[in-house]
């Protein structure tokens, strides 16, 4: 009898291991996301920049899905017209997703503070993070728009009146089991933060204050 009871207790203990792992690696939700920032997207002085935006996303992690469409949707809510032709855009937004995955929460601040184009390697465990660099180019748009085959960099430089950069880090203070990628709310929170920053740089669109930086 004691041996049978011991065997049952052992089976019960083993069955709880996957359950505990699931608790530690829950997906979480958008309300848990902390936003860290370095740099800012600035206004273009007194220039009259059309409220037309073009969004380009480079995801070097393949872990953040639908970020482009989310960013376009949020910009639309802020009063921008979104175009798929960069030569028609007054606001060209380049989003580079640099890292996504496990991180030591206390180490993320230094990575974000490294700023745009700085070191971007995440290290440690205990949290989950997304790191992105954002380049905003504001430009005049000629009234006569001709089709162009120039690349995005040339279009951004043409008629540019201002550019600014920022780095964003999104942090959830627990481990998340990464399947195909990060949970969808990471892309939504990042898109919302970007749209608010771009709207503030526009100065006329609906610029609700961003969530508090940490």
Q: Could you say what each language-model-derived stretch is?
A:
Residues 50, 88-90, 163:
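Sequence-level motif detector for i,i+2 pairs with an aromatic at +2
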Residues 87-159:
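Surface-exposed short loop/turn segments
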Residues 78-88:
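Short, well-structured beta-strand/strand-turn elements
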Residues 3, 67-68, 121-123:
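Intrinsically disordered, low-complexity segments enriched in polar/charged residues with Gly/Pro
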Residues 5, 12, 43-47, 83, ...:
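Generic marker of residues within folded, mature protein domains
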Residues 1-20:
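Sec-dependent bacterial lipoprotein signal peptides
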Residues 21-80, 98, 165-188, 192, ...:
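A structural "domain/chain start" motif
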